[in-house]
């Protein structure tokens, strides 16, 4: 499956909610969804009632877009979630939350998951003292995530420290905003997910 390279704002309009893919822009009047809260296209304002399958598919697409994951990898996460103890849907969300790019975003070390993915890919972060440039890297309890010392003086990280790093993070993470260091102190649970996600629909879709 190819990577989507179109405007991020079209994805928010397609899913009928803000996915916060553009960082600061999502909180301003420039947000395309705020101005046109309906699907893109000629007949976008004519919302159709979705079938059961349609709702399941839309929910899957929404979660994939929130976390920036393509189908093959998303399916792999679901298969992992099914093999874990507990509820498959909640396990799936926990795995997605544990992605390094998401953790960087949750710590406030990037304005969006998209930016976090880019910064991780460019080797600006270390995990337990070692450079990790794989956005899909799954963190575990005890892992320490930090901005590389050589990157801290870069203009973008100075801006990040001033604008985002001091914002609250989920309770499963702790951070030293001044030094741009974070630590995983617990695994994320369903209560830590702040987006309106109906994960049971995804489980139903993949269980057919």
From Swiss-Prot:
Keyword Ribosomal protein in record: yes
Keywords carried by this UniProt record: Ribonucleoprotein, Ribosomal protein, RNA-binding, rRNA-binding
Gene Ontology CC, one term: small ribosomal subunit
Entry coiled-coil feature ranges: none
SMART domains reported for this sequence: Ribosomal_S4 (SM01390), S4 (SM00363)
Gene3D superfamilies tied to this protein: Ribosomal Protein S4 Delta 41, Chain A, domain 1, RNA-binding S4 domain
Presence of the UniProt keyword Cell division in the record: no
Function (record text): One of the primary rRNA binding proteins, it binds directly to 16S rRNA where it nucleates assembly of the body of the 30S subunit.
The protein's name: Small ribosomal subunit protein uS4
Protein's organism: Caldicellulosiruptor bescii (strain ATCC BAA-1888 / DSM 6725 / KCTC 15123 / Z-1320) (Anaerocellum thermophilum)
Gene: rpsD
């Amino acid at each position: 499956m190819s990577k989507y390279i179109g405007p991020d704002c079209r994805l928010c309009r397609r899913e009928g909610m803000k996915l916060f893919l553009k960082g600061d822009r999502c909180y301003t009047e420039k947000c395309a969804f705020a101005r046109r809260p309906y699907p893109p296209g000629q007949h976008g304002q004519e919302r159709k009632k979705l079938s059961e399958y349609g709702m399941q598919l839309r929910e899957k697409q929404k979660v994939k877009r929130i976390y920036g994951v393509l189908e093959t990898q998303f399916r792999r996460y679901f298969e992992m979630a099914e093999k874990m103890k507990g509820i498959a849907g909640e396990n799936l969300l926990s795995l997605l939350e544990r992605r390094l790019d998401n953790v960087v975003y949750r710590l406030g070390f990037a304005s969006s998951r998209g930016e976090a993915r880019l910064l991780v890919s460019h080797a600006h972060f270390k995990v337990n003292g070692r450079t990790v440039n794989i956005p899909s890297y799954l963190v575990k309890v005890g892992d320490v995530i930090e901005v590389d010392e050589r990157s801290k003086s870069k203009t973008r990280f100075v801006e990040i420290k001033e604008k985002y790093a001091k914002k609250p993070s989920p309770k499963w993470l702790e951070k030293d905003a001044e030094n741009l260091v974070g630590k995983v102190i617990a695994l994320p649970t369903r209560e830590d997910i702040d987006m309106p996600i109906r994960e049971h629909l995804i489980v139903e879709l993949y269980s057919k």
